[in-house]
Structures are given as structure tokens and as C-alpha cells.
Amino acid sequence: MGFRIMNRNISYVFPNISTFNRNGRGGLHKRYKIAVDHGCSLIEVPADFVKNKTEVQLTGKKLGSVLSAQDIQKLYESGTPSKNIKYILHTEPQVSRRNGKGASCTPQLQWNNQKWVRDFANMAISISKIFGVPPAGIEIHPGGRHNTYSDIVRSIITIRELFKNSFNTIPFVVLENRTGQIVSNGEQIHDFWQVLLFKNKSLSKDVGIVLDIQQLYTVTKNDFLKQLNFIPHESVKGLHIHCKHRTPSVENKIPWAKVFAWIGKIKHKIFLNPEVHHHSQAIDTISFCNEMMKKHPTTTSQDCEKHATRNPGH
């Protein structure tokens, strides 16, 4: 039974739960059915590099390798249940991977290398082609300090152009804040946004941040609310809602009531991804979000907090 969405400006993403990835990465058919059953208008689909022992065996590639078109055929189920399906490709997050034999690998995101960026985009395009329908959006991650904010903005432009050339449509692109990467706290999100506006203000409608609340809390702890309030509301296109990839609770250290009060001040349409690993937890997390939004409905624009003005660091 589907959920009644509590806010017309909110869409839900059905997350990439573990059951979809038992022997490969699955496809759109099963994800779509479950998403529709639970009132989710968007679907999360993995688009990482080779990430585990099973994928090493299926592709014959090393951990952290970019997928070829042939690899993609081995990992994904083809086709789509609907030409109107909306899915988000969740791309390589630059995390440590293990092959089951003690070896590990952490692929490096190279936004400063335009050849690498094209290879990255072409892999995402090949995944989309096996489905026969382009993604609504693409989620990317900041990477290490060898990248700059300008590198990321330039890469986003390249990715969008390549998708336009392949599908004659352009996906939205969101950047997730990640612990240990160059965009992890509120000040860095603020500075990245300022660079994006300076480089190409027209991007701001379809490019922005997907704010992972748990990641922000992990990085900031006692400064969490201060850092949250550095983030321009207009930069946020979506949020990941979870507590260490489990269903949140008001008993968590994360001050969820204040988080949802902050979310309520966002005036444009956004998506919420209950980024957990199990089906039941996804449903419980959507219920949690609906309950929190009942208590913290959208406020008027004059109530919005003003953000500190800072000079971009990149």
C-alpha cells in the first residue's frame, strides 16, 4: 500500500536496497514495482565501478575498474517497465572496496582529468542505454583534494553535455557531501555553491547538492546546526535521510526535529532518499519522514534564516 505524500514539494526515492544486488545489480523492473507500491516517484540505481567479489567474478575486472559496455550487460537486467520511469544513477562514491580475499581498493575520483570524466560519463551512458531510457538524475561525489570546486563544476557541464548528445535530454546532477572528501561540511557546501553560481548561474536550476544528514553530522558533531545553517536552501535539490543507514528516530543524536524544520524552509521541489539497506527500513524511514513533515510544515519565506556570506575557497 502506497504512502500519502505529506508535502507536494517532496518526492521520495526508493533506495538501492541489498535485495536488488544479490547476483549483479538487477534492473528497473523489480525496483519500479516496489517503488510504485510505496508511493516513490524516483528510483535509485547503482552506477559504481567494480565494487565487490561477485562483480570481480562476473566481469573479470579488478576492484575499482570502470565498467565497459560488456561488463554492464553482465551486471544489469535490460529494459524498462515504462518509458516514463524516473531513476537516479548513484555513481562511484570513492570508498574502500574489498574483494573477499583480503585485498582492498579505493577508486579515485578525478574531476581534474577531463579524459577520466568522459570515461566516467560514458559508463553512466552505457548503463542508461541498457535500460533504454535516460536517467532523471545523476548523483556524484566530491573526491579528494586533488580536485577543486571548479573541476567539479566543469565536469558536471561535461557530463550533462554528453548525456544530451546521447539521449537529447539532460539529467539533473547532484553532488553529495562525503566524510573525508573536499565537500563534507556546511561551509564547504556553501563555498561550492558560490563557485557554481560564479561559473554558470544557469546551472543552479538543475544542479545542486543532495545533502546527506548523517554524513554532515559525522563530520560536524557539536557544530552540526551551525554547519547546517551555512548551507543555502536553494542549493539543496535532495536529501539522504538515515541514521548510519538505518531508520532514524527522534532519540538519535542527530536533532531530527530541527533538521526537518530546516527542510521546511526549502521553497522548491526536492527529493528525499531513505538511504537504508533493507526493504522494511525503507518503508519505516518514509513513515518517519512523513511524521516529521506533519510536525514541521513548510514555512513562509520571511521566516527563512539568513546565511553567512563567505568567500569561496576554490
Predicted regions and their residues:
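Active-site beta-loop-alpha junctions enriched in small/polar residues
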Residues: 15-22, 46-50, 92-94, 143-145, ...
